[in-house]
Amino acid sequence: MPLMFRADEETKTLRFPFDFEFTSVFTLDGHTLHHEVHVKNCGDENMRCGIGFHPGFNIPFDENHTTTDYEIRFEQEESPIILDCLPHGLLSGKSFYQWKNTQAIPLTDTLFDNDSFCLAGLRSKTIGIYEKNSERKIICDISEYPYTLLWSAPTKPMRFICIEPWQSLPAAETDTSEWNEHAAAACIAPNESYSITLHTTFER
């Protein structure tokens, strides 16, 4: 199922000052959902951009489970670097360790009381939501993404969790408003395209 969004005068004035086409294509193959994203530069100058996905998953999986029956699990042990984000979403320039030498992050209803966790430095190719007492899990392939954001609304009990693979980062607090000076995952030449896919597998 393809969905396309085209830049218009409003987006170029208020949001992103480039002429582009953004296409999302969803394909289901067995238990795996493939979400392809294609960005075309329709303008006459180079366009810098970075793609970040924002999938969210309901938990618990059924009414017989609660938040603590689940954990975020990496493919291997990790000591992720947490990139500190300010309340308005910009990077503060600070980083810290929240977990060290762990393969699993237990879910609790207070985990996201202080907002999200932007993970960097991961070696794992996958990260997922695992139900501890069953084979049910949701696994995201993050092998093409250097950053992964974990986030949920601070509601109790937790009703969903987002696993967001990113190819680039938000702007830093000290960045200027000039788009071409921001860090980006891709620089697309005029009439060229950039594509990336997120693979998510649902198992039970």
Describe each PLM feature range.
Residues 131-171:
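Glycine-rich active-site loops that engage anionic ligands at enzyme catalytic sites
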Residues 46-47, 56-143:
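Active-site/ligand-binding surface loops and adjacent short beta/alpha elements
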Residues 1-30:
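Extended, loop-rich substrate-binding clefts of extracytoplasmic carbohydrate-active enzymes
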Residues 37-43, 152:
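Asparagine-centered strand-capping/turn motif at beta-strand->loop junctions
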Residues 173-180:
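Short, structured beta-strand/loop micro-motifs enriched in basic residues and often containing a Trp
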Residues 37, 187-203:
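Short Pro-Gly-centered flexible turn/kink motifs
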Residues 43-44, 204:
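Short, acidic/polar linear motifs in exposed loop/turn regions
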